[in-house]
């Protein structure tokens, strides 16, 4: 695996391993770290917990996941999110089918988090952050769709601020 990418806003680190047309993403969530609810229009994901425990949101349901629970499939268009629930770091592994540009999405988002452009949940901190978010959402809307703010707000923001 290659080097790690750190997202301080969401308390996450990522490592990527290409797997043909697919991608393996290892994610480490700090205690309280979270990947906010979102969905992928064209990709399926297969999540498993390597170490620790997380609250996993799938559709409208939530459940606690541990290593012994095995792999959880997430079909395209299905809302999902993950929150670390223990008092120690959680390590997850996700197989993304197909990879498309998900690695770029996570790396770009983490870089913006390190620059302080947005707060948890993707809320821009200032006008520079709002412009960044509009361009980011426009660029990656085929990879990831955030469930907040609502899509009509995202579309309006893209229309007003994206270049």
Report the location of each language-model feature.
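Short acidic-glycine-tyrosine-enriched beta hairpin
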Residues: 18-21, 46, 60-79
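A short glycine-rich, His/Asp/Glu-containing loop-to-beta-strand
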Residues: 3-37, 43, 50
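Ligand-binding loop in jelly-roll beta-barrel domains
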Residues: 76-105
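Glycine- and acidic-residue-biased ligand/ion/polar-headgroup-sensing regions
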Residues: 42-54, 60
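Short, charged/polar surface micro-motifs in flexible loops or helix N-caps
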Residues: 30-33, 53, 98-102
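Acidic/histidine-enriched, glycine/proline-rich intrinsically disordered or flexible terminal extensions
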Residues: 109-163
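Tight coil/turn sites that cap or link beta-strands
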Residues: 30-32, 68-69, 77, 87
């Amino acid at each position: 695996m290659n080097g790690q990418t750190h997202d301080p806003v969401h308390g996450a680190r990522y490592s990527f391993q290409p797997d043909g047309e697919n991608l393996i993403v290892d994610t480490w969530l700090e205690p309280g770290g979270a990947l906010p609810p979102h969905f992928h229009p064209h990709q399926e994901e297969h999540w498993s917990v390597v170490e620790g425990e997380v609250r996993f949101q799938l559709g409208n349901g939530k459940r606690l996941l541990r290593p012994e629970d095995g792999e959880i499939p997430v079909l395209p268009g299905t809302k999902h999110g993950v929150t670390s629930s223990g008092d120690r770091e959680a390590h997850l592994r996700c197989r993304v089918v197909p990879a498309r540009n998900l690695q770029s999405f996570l790396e770009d988002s983490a870089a913006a988090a390190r620059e302080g452009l947005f707060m948890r949940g993707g809320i821009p901190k200032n006008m520079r952050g709002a412009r960044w978010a509009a361009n980011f959402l426009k660029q990656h809307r085929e990879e990831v769709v955030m469930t907040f703010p609502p899509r009509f707000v995202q579309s309006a923001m893209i229309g007003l601020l994206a270049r």
